Amino acid sequence: GGSSGLIAFPRL
């Protein structure tokens, strides 16, 4: 993840 564009949810 992480490509959602939301820094609030840093999906590694």
From Swiss-Prot:
It comes from the Eukaryota. It is found in: Secreted. InterPro entries: Periviscerokinin. Coiled coil: none annotated. One of its GO terms (biological process) is neuropeptide signaling pathway. Keywords: Amidation, Neuropeptide, Secreted. The keyword Secreted applies. GO terms for cellular component: extracellular region. According to PubMed:19808072, a longer form of this peptide exists, which is much more abundant than the short form. Mediates visceral muscle contractile activity (myotropic activity). This is Periviscerokinin-2. It comes from Sphodromantis viridis.
